[in-house]
Structure formats: C-alpha cells, structure tokens
C-alpha cells in the first residue's frame, strides 16, 4: 500500500524506493508491478 501510494502520488519517490527494493530482491515491483513482490 505504501509503495503504491508513493508511486501514484510522486513518481520521483519511485526511484529511491525502487533502489531499496532492488537490494531487498524485489526488483519486479519496480519494473512491472507491485503485486509481483
């Protein structure tokens, strides 16, 4: 919910969030959809 809200609210936040998720092994969320996580 947090990620989806941030993405819908501010695309700029998607970048830092994506990088953090990448380290967590959740790159699918950044590339395709949040549900992929």
Curated annotation (Swiss-Prot):
Propeptide residue range(s): 1-2
Sorted UniProt keywords? Cleavage on pair of basic residues, Disulfide bond, Hormone, Secreted
- Which compartment or compartments is the protein found in? Secreted
Membrane-traversing stretches: none
Q: Tell me the GO molecular function terms.
A: hormone activity
Is DNA-binding included in the keywords of this UniProt record? no
Disulfide bond annotation, renumbered to this chain:
26-37
> Principal place where this protein is found?
secreted
GO terms in the biological process aspect are: regulation of cell migration
Q: Which Pfam families match?
A: Somatostatin
Q: Which GO terms describe its cellular component?
A: extracellular space
Q: Which family does it belong to?
A: Belongs to the somatostatin family.
Q: What does this protein do?
A: Somatostatin inhibits the release of somatotropin.
Stated name of the protein? Somatostatin-37
Q: Which organism is it from?
A: Petromyzon marinus
Q: Which gene encodes it?
A: sst
């Amino acid at each position: 919910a947090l990620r989806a809200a941030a993405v819908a609210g501010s695309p700029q936040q998607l970048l830092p969030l994506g990088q953090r998720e990448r380290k967590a092994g959740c790159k699918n969320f950044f590339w395709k959809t949040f549900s992929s996580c």
